[in-house]
């Protein structure tokens, strides 16, 4: 892409970046989920992958609505988070058990917080650009992510972390 000079161009560039981010997170979760031992955690990770796929379809729709070629732009930020997630949940992680589940939740939340930040930013851009429907849809995606994050926190605090002690 050429040099960005307008908020509109930045908006589309960020949408494409988020698409890549989502794809990378789903790939990471697909590798991590089989290592989770708490049944509720496994279920939550599977549900999350479906939610991320839904948000990815939204991103594609929003990119297309801007008259842009529907393609993603590789997100190096998520690439780093995914590398850390794999390291801490597979490569250098306990084989199984509550400590591993706690690590999985921690890494999931790091990646999710990146998504919350990115989607929140593009939602604000959409508002400034008076793309009201985009703003509303992106805001709903942020709410979904917050809810997922809160559910992971509840699981960690009510079960996994105490089991890991």
Predicted regions located by residue number:
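Amphipathic alpha-helical hairpins
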Residues: 1-165
């Amino acid at each position: 892409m050429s040099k960005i000079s307008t908020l509109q161009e930045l908006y589309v560039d960020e949408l494409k970046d988020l698409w890549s981010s989502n794809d990378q997170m789903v790939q990471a979760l697909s590798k991590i989920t089989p290592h989770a031992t708490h049944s509720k955690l496994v279920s939550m990770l599977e549900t999350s992958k479906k939610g991320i796929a839904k948000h990815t379809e939204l991103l594609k729709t929003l990119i297309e609505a801007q008259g842009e070629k529907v393609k993603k732009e590789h997100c190096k930020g998520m690439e780093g988070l995914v590398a850390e997630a794999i390291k801490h949940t597979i490569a250098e992680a306990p084989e199984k058990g509550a400590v591993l589940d706690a690590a999985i939740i921690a890494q999931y939340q790091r990646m999710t917080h990146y998504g919350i930040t990115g989607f929140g930013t593009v939602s604000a851009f959409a508002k400034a650009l008076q793309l009201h429907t985009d703003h509303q849809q992106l805001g709903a995606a942020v709410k979904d992510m917050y809810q997922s994050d809160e559910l992971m926190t509840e699981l960690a605090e009510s079960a996994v972390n105490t089991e890991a002690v």
